[in-house]
Amino acid sequence: MATTGRVLLLSPPSLSSHPEKLNTVLKSHTRDKTDLQMLDRLAHGLVSLPESTYDIVLLLTGADNTLAETHSLLNRELIQRVVHSLRPAGKLRNRENKPWGLSDGNGNNANSSRRYNDDEQRFRNEVILAGLVFDDKGELLKPDIGAQQAIPLKLGRRKKEKEKTDTLASSANYITNGTVDAPASNGISAPIPAAKTTENNPVPPGVGFIDFSDDFGVPAEDDLEDSDEELIDEDELLDEDDMGRQIVQPPECRPKPGKRRRACKDCSCGLSQKLEAKDKAQRATADKALETMKLGSSELAEVDFTVQGKVGSCGNCSLGDAFRCDGCPYIGLPAFKPGEEVRLLNNDVQL
């Protein structure tokens, strides 16, 4: 199978005991553009995959020529790592390069009448949750998010624009050439000077006004007709099954080997409270253990290691180094024997 771009081959561990099958697969690919990784080593974190590197990730079949072993090893974390290693518009294929087919929601393949087993259905669900989509040919494709275009939001300003236009039109009927026609007492209308405008009475410096009718450059005729759509309740987006799933910790948040797990600054995921509660529980357990080791005054006994009735010429040198004088020539020697008399005269030992 000739392919262009970098290719990653994911092999189950059972294929390593059949080198002839593995060599057959490797012969059909260009070695300088092909990498081979074992799924069990990836699952245990012994090796890592580079991000946005491969154009095609190929899942190899096991020794039984099925993908059962491969599906059983591909958990959620490993699938996300594989998807991150794909480039935008990269594809996830199997060894036979057969299309995965489209699922109809009941676990059935639109291209065949068989029903997927639990591992296959779980694999299909996990790759979709990881961000892959099915293209027109039934292949799993990583969408190119960077190629998508941003759509500007339409602000509902149609009513305000219409009211503003009607107000200006009605004002124009009464104000002409800076005067307002007002009825007089004799039935003759008399011109009255109009109010001063902002040109005649400018706004004082440092004073600003907010125009809430501003449409931010979006024409009123381009506004959406259904601007008052029903809002989606965010509490209904996740059900109990989603809330009970295990949280996947990002690699950058995992503690390094041999180091204690620490929470980020301004932690909002609950890890800080969890670690604080764990520390309090450990401190309480240690304090409780220390309480059992404390002894009362009645349980303490004083031990005297002094040899009774044995003194030297100074009164202490026969008891050992701890009781000898600073200038005693016997410092560093064992204690005298019981009953042995020692006398010092001019710093000379007299036995």
Swiss-Prot record:
Essential cofactor(s): [2Fe-2S] cluster; [4Fe-4S] cluster
Predominant cellular place of this UniProt entry's protein: cytoplasm
Region (N-terminal SAM-like domain): 1-151
Residues reported in the UniProt entry to bind [4Fe-4S] cluster: C314, C317, C325, C328
Keyword annotations from UniProtKB, A to Z: 2Fe-2S, 4Fe-4S, Cytoplasm, Iron, Iron-sulfur, Metal-binding, Mitochondrion
Keyword Metal-binding belongs to the record: yes
GO biological process assignments: iron-sulfur cluster assembly
Biased composition (Polar residues): 105-114
Segments for region (Fe-S binding site B): 314-328
Residues noted as binding [2Fe-2S] cluster in the record, renumbered to the chain: C253, C264, C267, C269
Positions occupied by motif Cx2C motif 2: 325-328
Domain of life: Eukaryota
Motif Cx2C motif 1 positions after renumbering to this chain: 314-317
Subunit structure: Monomer. Interacts with TAH18. Interacts with MIA40.
Entry's family note: Belongs to the anamorsin family.
Domain notes: The C-terminal domain binds 2 Fe-S clusters but is otherwise mostly in an intrinsically disordered conformation.
Name this protein carries in UniProt: Fe-S cluster assembly protein DRE2
